Every structure is written in C-alpha cells, then in structure tokens.
Amino acid sequence: MASRRMETKPVITCLKTLLIIYSFVFWITGVILLAVGVWGKLTLGTYISLIAENSTNAPYVLIGTGTTIVVFGLFGCFATCRGSPWMLKLYAMFLSLVFLAELVAGISGFVFRHEIKDTFLRTYTDAMQTYNGNDERSRAVDHVQRSLSCCGVQNYTNWSTSPYFLEHGIPPSCCMNETDCNPQDLHNLTVAATKVNQKGCYDLVTSFMETNMGIIAGVAFGIAFSQLIGMLLACCLSRFITANQYEMV
C-alpha cells in the first residue's frame, strides 16, 4: 500500500504543475477577452452600431465572459494547490460549459457569416438613407468612411439616392482631402469623382471578413478545444487525489 502511494505522489505533483500552468494560461485568456471587450466598446462602437440592426451587447458579453474566466482561472489555481477533489470537479464542469459555449459561438459565427454581411448591407444602406450628419448613426457612417477611406455602400454614387444629397451633396467624410472639397463639387457626381474615395465601404468590410474568417475560426476553435485539456487534467488530478486518500485509510 505504501509503495502505491509513493507511485501516485509523483503523478499528482506532475498533474498539479501542468494544471497550474494551464490555469494561468486560461486566466491570461480571460484578461485578453476582458481587454478586447473594453477596447471594442471604446473603439469599435461605431462599427458595431452599423453591423447590428438593433443595439448589441457584444462588448459587454466579452467583458462578462473575460471577467468570469479570470475568476475561474484563479479558482482553478486555488483548487489545484488545495488539492480538493470536489473543487477540481467543479473546475472541470466550468471548463466543459466554456467549451460548449465557445464551440456554439464559433459554429454560429461561421455558419451565419453571410447573414452578418446581409445585415451590414441593410443597416449601412438604411444609415445612408437617414443620414443627417448629426445623429449617432450619421457620425458612425462618417467615422467608417474616414477611417477606411471609402464612400457609400458599393461606391460614392450610392449617395445620390439619399435625401441628404439633395440638400448637401455627398458628405465631406467621403473626401480624399476635406480641405479640397467644397459643397458645389460634392453636389456634382462627375466632379465629385475626382474628389472623393471611389471604393465602397461594404466591399472593404466584407472582404476583410472573408479574408480573416478562416484565421478567426481557427483561433476560436483552438481556444475552445484547449478547454478539453484543462478538463482532462482536472478530472485526472481529482481521481488520483481521491485514490491516494483511500489508500491512506
């Protein structure tokens, strides 16, 4: 019996070391998600408001998920150091829930990527039709056009169907150089062709999505399946600790 305890102790020590390392990496993942959520709320709010038909809580979901992972990452380290079988089982159960949630989110994002593109087309077209240069969505359109050096949905001529165009012409945010644009030029599509950006914003955004979708999906599934490693380590460690406790009785 004593020899078996001697055999299991090195295994337990090894599993504890691996699980602590994993939990630390898991904790870092939570910090990254939390940072991305805050960054997305502060920086990408204008883009998100145009991609989503209704108000979206995506940044808050990332912040909440990141915070939860940070807490459970610390819990995993504590449970590992404490060597508590029930805590390790609880940690494994949480990792399984995270795995399922990330897997569903990754599959949904990949399957519905075309719906996301269609939604962006509808919302951006609607934002152009209701553009007045002052409200939040109008400022979002201006921000996208300036930051991406684009104009309109497909191209700058899309603005000719907007009520704003009849009074003000193409928005100055379309100009390659706003100091070189005047209202008269922006009222004339022929003259404006030499003053404004030619590429449409829809093509730029969707081409970026298509180009990076494989990378994003690969990273998402990689992170999701990494939870299986943590689940395996936590379950194995819990089993060995329980077995070792029985051997001591």
UniProtKB/Swiss-Prot annotation:
- Topology check: give the Extracellular ranges: 41-56, 113-213
**Cytoplasmic-side segments:** 1-16, 76-86, 235-249
Residue ranges crossing the lipid bilayer per the database entry: 17-40, 57-75, 87-112, 214-234
Q: Which GO terms describe its cellular component?
A: plasma membrane
The set of disulfide-linked cysteines is none
Glycosylated at which positions?
N54, N155, N158, N177, N188
Enumerate the subcellular locations listed in this protein's record, separating them with semicolons. Answer: Membrane
Tissue expr: Not solely expressed in T-cells. Expressed in acute myelocytic leukemia cells of some patients.
List where this protein forms a coiled coil: none
Keywords of this entry: Disease variant, Glycoprotein, Host-virus interaction, Intellectual disability, Membrane, Transmembrane, Transmembrane helix
Q: What is the topology of this protein in the membrane according to its UniProt annotation?
A: Multi-pass membrane protein
Q: Does the keyword Transmembrane apply?
A: yes
Disease the record associates with this protein: Intellectual developmental disorder, X-linked 58: A disorder characterized by significantly below average general intellectual functioning associated with impairments in adaptive behavior and manifested during the developmental period. Intellectual deficiency is the only primary symptom of non-syndromic X-linked intellectual disability, while syndromic intellectual disability presents with associated physical, neurological and/or psychiatric manifestations.
Question: Could you describe the subunit structure of this protein?
Answer: (Microbial infection) Interacts with herpes simplex virus 1 (HHV-1) UL35.
User: What family is reported?
Assistant: Belongs to the tetraspanin (TM4SF) family.
Q: What does this protein do?
A: May be involved in cell proliferation and cell motility.
Can you name this protein?
Answer: Tetraspanin-7
State the organism of origin.
Homo sapiens
